[in-house]
């Protein structure tokens, strides 16, 4: 996922973990 820039990207960032 992308960096946390928006609320929509928050879940994508968790997947990057």
Curated annotation (Swiss-Prot):
It comes from the Bacteria. Keywords: Bacterial flagellum, Secreted. It comes from Bartonella bacilliformis. GO terms for cellular component: bacterial-type flagellum; extracellular region. Flagellin is the subunit protein which polymerizes to form the filaments of bacterial flagella. Flagella are an important component in the invasiveness of B.bacilliformis. Its main location: secreted. Belongs to the bacterial flagellin family. It is found in: Secreted; Bacterial flagellum. The keyword Secreted applies. The lineage of its organism: Bacteria, Pseudomonadati, Pseudomonadota, Alphaproteobacteria, Hyphomicrobiales. This is Flagellin.
